[in-house]
Structure formats: C-alpha cells, structure tokens
Amino acid sequence: MVAAGLTMLVGVAGALAQNDVKRILSFHVVSQIGYMLMGLGLFTVAGVAGAVLFLVHQIPVKTVMFLVGGLIEDDQGNSSLDKVGGLAARRPIIAVLFAIPALSLAGIPPFSGFVAKLSLIDAGINAGSVAIVVVALVASMFTLLSMSKIWLGVFWREPTPPSEPASSKASKRTMNGATMAAVAGTLAVVALAGPLWNMSEEIARDLLDGQTYIDEVLGTDRGGVASP
C-alpha cells in the first residue's frame, strides 16, 4: 500500500510541476499505476476487480489524452503551455475531445474514471484501508488541478499564433476521427459498467483462487488430470 500511495502522489506531483502537455500526461501514467497497485494490494475480490476495471478504463482514456496531445502539437507546432492558447475558440472539437477524458481521468461523474475509482475506494473502505483511500482522493484532486492547468493554458487563454504550419485538412480529419473513436471507447466503459464489473469480479476470483489459475494455465481439471 505504501508503494501504491507513493506512486499516486509522486506521479501527480510530477505532473503539476510540468509545463508541457505531453510531459504532464506522461507523469499521469505513473500516477494512475498507483490506483491499480492499490486494488491489487487490497488482495480482496473487490479490490482486484477494481484494479481490473480501472485498467479497462485507462486504456481508452490514455489513448485519447495522448491523441489530443498530438492534435494540440499539430495545430500549434508545439505542446508547451507557454506557447499555445486559444484552442477552445479556434478548434472547439479539440476542446471537447480533451474535456471528456480529462474529467474521466480526474474521476468526475458520470465518466468512466468515476466508476473505476469509486470501485477502488469502496473496496478500500470495506477492507479497512482508510489511509490509501484518502491518498487516492487527494491524488484525484491534484489530477483535476493538472487537467485544469492544461485547459487554462491551451484552451482558455488568449490565442497564440502557431509556431509551425498545421498539417493538411485530410490529415486533421484522420486524427480527429481516430480521437473520436477512442472517446467513444471511454463512453462505452460507462455504458457497459455493469457487465464490465461482473467480468472484473470473475477475473479477480480466478486470480485469487490459485488452483483455478493453475488449472487454466496448465489445462487441467480439479483432479489435476490434464484436459484432452
């Protein structure tokens, strides 16, 4: 649990200290690993299931965030918060594509991050691990602050001229389409939260049941006899 808490806090502190979109997102990769370590460290069905669900949520969200980082750099010529601005007015589609995964990353309802983090927090409370729950909530608050930092720097402040010419319209359409598809994936996690939780619980039970895991890997039945 100490490793989980430190990973959350060190990652999010590093993100807050950065002034570049891609570097902020890179530090958040570290921070989010801490949540998965939290679930695994609880060593309960609910905790491990929460870690699995959190992983499912993270895959599309992180994909979107880095794709949006690429869209920002493509439009502005760089991703430094000191050299970009005004995208909400000029490229509102990028603003929307950023806002959805950013709120999800911070665990704001009704997005997938809220569902995933709530499952971990509930598992932590039920396991009596209040300290790691508090750390997780603090890390989520700082995550929201770092996402707000990107929003204010890139989208909200006065526009700045691009340092390099943007790519062609055809290339922009391709990049926007890929990002929209990934955003749809984050929304699908919310829509399918029930079935995904059931799947996560089943995976957690199998992982915590050593014999079941051995049987699945070796292809044996409960009697230890190899399956045909």
Regions found by a protein language model. Give the residues of each.
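Hydrophobic transmembrane alpha-helices and their helix-loop junctions in integral membrane proteins
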Residues: 1-118, 122-148, 152
